[in-house]
Amino acid sequence: MVPLCLLLYLATLVFPPVYSAHLLSPEPTDWVSSEVEVFLEDYVAGVGDTVVLSCTPQDFLLPIVWQKDGDAVSSSNRTRVGQKALRIINVSYEDSGVYSCRHAHKSMLLSNYTVKVIDSLSSGDDEDYDEDEDEAGNGNAEAPYWTRSDRMEKKLLAVPAANTVKFRCPAAGNPTPSIHWLKNGKEFKGEQRMGGIKLRHQQWSLVMESAVPSDRGNYTCVVQNKYGSIKHTYQLDVLERSPHRPILQAGLPANQTVVVGSDVEFHCKVYSDAQPHIQWLKHIEVNGSQYGPNGAPYVNVLKTAGINTTDKELEILYLTNVSFEDAGQYTCLAGNSIGYNHHSAWLTVLPAVEMEREDDYADILIYVTSCVLFILTMVIIILCRMWINTQKTLPAPPVQKLSKFPLKRQVSLESNSSMNSNTPLVRIARLSSSDGPMLPNVSELELPSDPKWEFTRTKLTLGKPLGEGCFGQVVMAEAIGIDKEKPNKPLTVAVKMLKDDGTDKDLSDLVSEMEMMKMIGKHKNIINLLGACTQDGPLYVLVEYASKGNLREYLRARRPPGMDYSFDTCKIPNETLTFKDLVSCAYQVARGMEYLASKKCIHRDPAARNVLVTEDNVMKIADFGLARDVHNIDYYKKTTNGRLPVKWMAPEALFDRVYTHQSDVWSYGVLLWEIFTLGGSPYPGIPVEELFKLLKEGHRMDKPANCTHELYMIMRECWHAVPSQRPTFRQLVEDHDRVLSMTSTDEYLDLSVPFEQYSPTCPDSNSTCSSGDDSVFAHDPLPEEPCLPKHHHSNGVIRT
């Protein structure tokens, strides 16, 4: 028992085109001359594009000198060096590097750019684009014009502080116009804002993260080409949050009177802008007194914020099978960093009144009639089954002729794809034979041979099992000659095959996955098909072997030592992961998902458990070719490894069963969270039913301890409620590449941050783990204990 304290320490919620050279948020470099602060700006262009780098001289009488990687740049057939700009046409990979301009005979830098040339950019890859924007322009010269003026009608935008702001001015013209932004009538650059800006020229957009009051003003987009110019102005107002102590709804909790043995619920509705801390207290007596020497009442803490409790759960106090000792005064105490508030209610417990027993002949008649009807129903069912068995004819003789049936693909493709999901891709011949099938539930079937992928069965040596999948099993094997460059050298592969109890449906799924992998092709960051054994035996599908298992277990095995894990804490991991290693994992997975999206393939379940790691630490996405029946998924049933698939699914996939590339982006955001928690469990301790409500209310997971603010904002963009507002995988690759290039190779993880809240010891629901903080939503950590002074008494009651 403790006296009721009036102070609670709580944390508040912190909660060929031509490209312009101002694309990404600038950051100051360490080696720039101290005379003028120059920002290094990242510039990404596609092969064959035209690059224009601007330079504003301080003295127009002095000549300008351009340098690339420290060497002077001179004019050529592709390069034009001017007094105000450097223009490079038909750029190639060799044009990548660091460009700077300065006055001749002076060391002062005027501008500085990092240029990276990648594969040719295509606006068609941006899923945020509208079709009418892509089709704008018919070859005739025309001045700029707005393509979606209906989306630009809202000129005043008011957002709370810390939110992300995005302005768009979609336009078109011929030639393709350029766009630049003004703030309050002046040129708006990234260095003018502490958090930087993102300029996505392909989307005609300006993005500002973590808005602050200084961002208020008028933002004007100016779109122009040589035939004209248009502009549009938005007004931004950033609203500061008004701090206040928690507000409790009047009348709650309410007094209650119940009989002994009943169940009781007390409700307490709390309203607070800052994250509240809620406790339920019961007033007690000590030595016949309800108050201590200092005038504070004696109380027992019945319920407080814990590891796996949410605000919604804390707002209700449950008392089951109440006794006379439970009668008394109960208090709901809520506080935040501003102050506290509390409401109290009384519970009255009455003795049970024994009711006189009356014979209810109607009830007895109902029970007897029900029993008779049940017995009659069972008798009828037994008689019908006996009659059906007597009517069965003898088995038909074996079929003597060859019958064929088409195997239809069951994979996830976009409706506009050229690959029709109902087109027969493989025709299987069913063999008639007096012998039984090789597998008990699978008919003996003959698959047509594909010379491009067929592998000789005698050159394959099967090894130990690696695991079981949805419809088969996977074993390790040695394949001699499968590598065309080394025909006599064995290569370790993974072989997918049916289980002993496989069915015709399982075979159909395995063939569909094999055909899907053939069509998708090869990429470094996906599991690639190597071959197949389809003749003279069971079907074997040969794929690449990843020796280090799936990404989830790979990360957990490399967590820093000394933490409270379920496995041996004395075992030191063989490899130590740096922050750059984690960013590299995320970058490689994004590359693989970008490739699958380019092939119009929707994965539906991108998660760390579906990413495999090779001996060289290459990330490879697996199971993208599986045929999934989304209408038959048991959303409440855990998988074999204890994971809940719904925790990776986008809201539109959960509630409307709509699967798109945007829903894959949402799942990728959860995968990012897994990476930076080193294999943590998403939404630990949150029941599935509660998760549905939390997602609808806009709750999102908190920033992992070893994750930068920039990467966390990428996660939040992936979890945008509106699918079209989420980034594309191409944009995610660009963002990760930029973070990767700016990350130090010796930036190790912070070992002082506890990982046990993400440990596999915490079950997915009804967890009793006692970590220091299990806040999985965007809230700051709470203090370890509220300021309720206490010490232990021998009878277990807390006393002041």
From Swiss-Prot:
One Gene Ontology term, aspect cellular component: plasma membrane
Entry keyword set: Apoptosis, ATP-binding, Cell membrane, Disulfide bond, Glycoprotein, Immunoglobulin domain, Kinase, Membrane, Nucleotide-binding, Phosphoprotein, Receptor, Repeat, Signal, Transferase, Transmembrane, Transmembrane helix, Tyrosine-protein kinase
Top-level EC class: transferase
Compositionally biased spans, kind Polar residues: 764-773
Molecular functions (GO terms): ATP binding; fibroblast growth factor binding; fibroblast growth factor receptor activity
Annotated S-S bridges: C55-C101, C169-C221, C268-C332
Record bears the keyword Transmembrane: yes
Enzyme Commission number, as recorded: 2.7.10.1
Gene Ontology biological-process annotations: apoptotic process; fibroblast growth factor receptor signaling pathway; positive regulation of cell population proliferation; positive regulation of MAPK cascade; regulation of hematopoietic stem cell differentiation
Entry keyword Transcription: no
Post-translational modification: Autophosphorylated. Binding of FGF family members together with heparan sulfate proteoglycan or heparin promotes receptor dimerization and autophosphorylation on tyrosine residues. Autophosphorylation occurs in trans between the two FGFR molecules present in the dimer.
Membrane topology classification: Single-pass type I membrane protein
CDD domains, A to Z: IgI_2_FGFR, PTKc_FGFR3
Segments passing through the bilayer: 364-384
Main location group: membrane
Protein family per UniProt: Belongs to the protein kinase superfamily. Tyr protein kinase family. Fibroblast growth factor receptor subfamily.
SUBUNIT field: Monomer. Homodimer after ligand binding.
Name under which the protein is recorded: Fibroblast growth factor receptor 3
Annotated gene: fgfr3
